[in-house]
Amino acid sequence: MASASLDRLFHPRSVAVFGSVKRGKIGHQLLTQLVEGGFPGALLAVNPRAEAPEGLPSVPAFAALKPSAQPVDLALVAVPAPFVNEVILSCGAAGVPFAVVLTSGFAEAGHVEEERALARAACQAGVRLIGPNCAGIMNTASRLYASIEVRALPGRTAFLTQSGAVGGAVLGLARERGIGFSTFVSYGNRADIDEAELLEYLSEDPQTGVIGLYLESLSDGREFLRTVQRVTRRKPVVIIKAGRSGSGLRAAGSHTGALAGSDAVFQAMVQQSGAVRVPGMEEMLDLCEGFTRLAPLAGSRVVIVTNSGGPGILTADRAEELGLEVPPTPETVRAALREFLPAHCALANPIDLTVEGTRENYSRALRAALAGEGFDAAVAINVATPFLDSVALAEGILEAASELEGAEGGRVQGGPAQPTAKGSARAPKPLAAVFMAGEIVVEASRRLKDGGVPVLPTGERAAAVLAGLRDYYRHRERPGGELPPDPDPETLSLAADGPVLEPDLVDFLEAEGFPFPPHAYARSERQALEAAGRLGFPLVLKAVSPRILHKSDAGGVVLGLRSLQAVRRAYAAMRGRLEGQDLRGVMLYRQVEGAVEMIAGVKRDPAFGPVVLVGAGGLFTELLRDACLRIAPFEREEALRMIGSLRAARLLQGYRGSPARDRGALADLLARLARLASRYPAIRELDFNPVFVLERGALIGDVRLLV
């Protein structure tokens, strides 16, 4: 849908409010917000008795809305739920293109069919809907405050929220911190317009520099991923996702299912999309302010300039936990610092100016650190006391930012700009401030914000902002686009109710190009001995039974068989152990030695479809929980990034003298698995555990399928 399609929603020429306009009612609150917010267009109150709103003499009242010379672009609906459809149909008859339905009592209260009827009525009437069960919308450029929440300050952040209460809390917190918004949308139950359509529109809105989003659920996860992938190529998206706890996970029938819980899948979507996820409201405001005020971050090396050692160390610790670097101060910078800092100041990074640090110390230290090539960003920390002039220290930081901007021929602050052109001599560098100690730093903090420098309450939160910038700009530089279109679904010939037997599954997967060690299926001892003679030794013997899910736990796997006699004994012992387990025979494999064991698998998520997993494999899969997920399909480059994100990647690179293993072969297997899962929607879960990664090639050691 074209981005211009929502223009009249956010830039209406006139607004009609449906519902009671008595003081204290939602209709009256909406009109009060619009009048006091300075909405420049026409306002109308519509209710059956044509009651005029108390205390708002400029707003005319009507018993019904009729087509007129003054068209209405937006209806705000705050009538009881049984009357909403009637209002929407009347809006359609009057040519109103948009309605925001604040009324509750629909799907959120269990009345799903009533909400479907509302959506049908809106479609019939040609009216696009926000809501129901929402808190309204705002657009500060249009002075449209069509919401029951506190009016937003003007700014360059757009905020979309499923929860009206969370939206109100964010607006209140932002107002306390002086953070403004371009657009606010509480979209509630999204009976029509959803977060994906709003994101597309805001991605092209010139008033919006960054988009914040509070989510509780998604109606179409795959389409949402594609949308966010497109949007983040143009501007940052910062997401809060509720429901991270283990109570949202289901019981799983495979290793992949156990590792790929619902929140883990959502996190994979975030990483794949280029969005940045934060845990809560304050962190979202931190990062949105960072994106609107800070220059793009070109690297990960951070210098910390502080007047107190403890907060500097805490900041450094958190920065490194988040994958940022806090490298030693280069000798060239140390030499410059020695020219003006007292001998007792620590220069290592953090650079500790001590409590005696002055305006000049901050200004010159920041300029010395950021002027060269040793650092990509800075955090300036001031732990104030009643005896320090924090305003003067703030002026020193602003002075450094201003002079660096002029010296580098570009803005030190002011993101989110387009990516810095490759080959430019100097890139702008982010500079964030941390001013602590409550009331005594209020004026200093205000001056910093007015000068374009964001102020965070702790160094740890400043580090999180820089890490968020790093993640976003690093992802935006990667080649590649959105999730490919889903292939036409194919029927799985193995489809059955329950586990598929290993011999059939291996034959199917080999035909699809997946590699296995030399193997054979034997239904009797004689067949097992004949197969062993053909395959050679050592061998692995594995039970084939529809009742056994984890073979090693049940005694259904025997390793290291090096003779026909050993195979005969193992076969007889296995039949005895598994009596009554519906043993259908055994699989024999040539045993793979000298490999790194990994796991690869796929799980079908209800919101995002097929999700591929790679991680540390073998016996320690769920113990170590070292795994990475991606939504399928994807290609080899994405698979290589997945592998590189694992702690187990060090084993593949060659560890303590061991040879490097074939990461490329593992990546090819993952990409092939992603394509397979996309073609066969009947696959619910598929495990390859272990996958033996060799110096050349990779082989699947065990496989399990649920359909």
PLM features: what roles do these ranges have?
Residues 1-707:
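Catalytic-core regions of core metabolic enzymes
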